[in-house]
Amino acid sequence: ELKKLREDKHYYGNFGKQFLSNSDISTLLTNPLPLGQSMKPIPAFLVGGYFHTAILEPHKLKNFKIIDATSRNTKAYKEITNGELCLLQHEVDKTEMLVDTMMTNEVCRDLIRGKNVEYEVPGIAEIHGQLWKGKADIINHDEKLIIDLKTTADISKFKYSATKYNYNSQAYIYQELFGYEMIFMA
């Protein structure tokens, strides 16, 4: 099962839906009826995905469709994308600057690129009678840390995002799954 969850198509697809994940917490807290249904993609998550990929799996960046348009409302964007959500070139440029900033920070770089580090590691565990899954961005075995990469439009508002997206429950679930303390890098 874990090997299958390494592939995004299984982790996010039907196979992965048999497990609860931190993404389900908001649904469970606010309106459990749509539990298990796919979420509509939004630009912020697409940008976050690009950021993760640029740091953890740069060989997969070619899978992102990038449009040189000023906004998603332009005629050119709509004609090229055919309704598909795509990255805008200026979003990619800004994200590449964020990647450079993170990777030139010595502490961040050493935690991300340490000697005994794994990327995109899936985990499954029974927690309080339910099967949960998670995929750790980075497991640094030397530091005994799970590292989760986050993007934010405004770092001063990150604490509100942490509440909104239930990072506290994510930290708990991942500590149960992987046995290390979790930190967030934004």
Q: Language-model features: where?
A:
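Metal-dependent nuclease catalytic cores that hydrolyze phosphodiester bonds in DNA/RNA
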Residues: E1-K133
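Mg2+/Mn2+-dependent nuclease catalytic core
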Residues: N116, V121-A186
